[in-house]
Structure formats: structure tokens, C-alpha cells
Amino acid sequence: MIIYLHGFDSNSPGNHEKVLQLQFIDPDVRLISYSTRHPKHDMQHLLKEVDKMLQLNVDERPLICGVGLGGYWAERIGFLCDIRQVIFNPNLFPYENMEGKIDRPEEYADIATKCVTNFREKNRDRCLVILSRNDESLNSQRTSEELHHYYEIVWDEEQTHKFKNISPHLQRIKAFKTLG
């Protein structure tokens, strides 16, 4: 089972395309939708939905995937639910760059302070990070500097922030999922 979390643009047709691409790895791909506008509510909702899916799951090696803001959540929810994560161009600093787009961006900073202390150290090697060198929305170099101590970083030379085509990375993702 692969759980997919969309980014800020929840209505993007690219979400459906990514789900279809992920089905080449595992036919059981589940999209969880969330508001993107209310961080604390989103966290509760995502934890509840992922936990529900894991309770009904028969896959011994489930995976959670997210793009952009979905990558922010996939890393945290995956850690809290003890499943491996694959994150594409994760938005690690939504409290800095989501002002005016969401109701309370400061809630992201609050969530960060309430999360398990040093969670990335405890999550070491359980997350695969795929970054675009052509990310027009986020500073992928800053993201790499933040995460490379803990996770493998894979660079993509062609995709933009929304990462429309993940197919060149499917074999790597499948291998990572298999490690479970």
C-alpha cells in the first residue's frame, strides 16, 4: 500500500497522474485529501486517516508519499505512524512561505516545536527525498542542507516543483519500499 498526500494545490490534475504512476509500484495507492489551510486540524485528520488505513492494511511494507506541502506531512505522519516515507520537493518551511495562502501559517512552527525532539535523527534512513534542481517555488538547496544528514537525497534535473513526472524514480522508490 502507498498512501499519497497532495501538495497545497489539491485540485491539480498532476495528483491523479502521480497516483497512476505509483500504481506501477503497488496497485493499492490511496490518496488522502486534507484542507491544506488549517495545519493543526490537518495533522489530526491525517494521523487519523493514516492510522485507519494501516489498521486495515495487509501490506507488510506500506509507504507514504507526498509532494510539496504533502511532503512536509508525509515525513512527519510517516514517522509518527512508523512507516517509510518518500517526499518530493518537500515544503519544510511552510510557516515562512505560506503566509497569505493559509489561515495560520504560524501553526506549522508550533507543530515543529511540539513534534518529537530530534525526530529526523530517530527517523534516519526511513525517508527518501527527491528534489528538483528546477523547483521554482522552494529553495531545494536549503532543503538538501536540512535533510542530507538524515536521508538519502536524489536529484532530478528536469522536473519543476509539482513534480508532474515521477516515473524516472519509480524503480528507486520500489527498492526503497521493499527495504521496509
UniProtKB/Swiss-Prot annotation:
It holds the Pfam family UPF0227. It comes from the Bacteria. HAMAP family: UPF0227. Belongs to the UPF0227 family. This is UPF0227 protein YcfP. It comes from Escherichia coli O7:K1 (strain IAI39 / ExPEC).
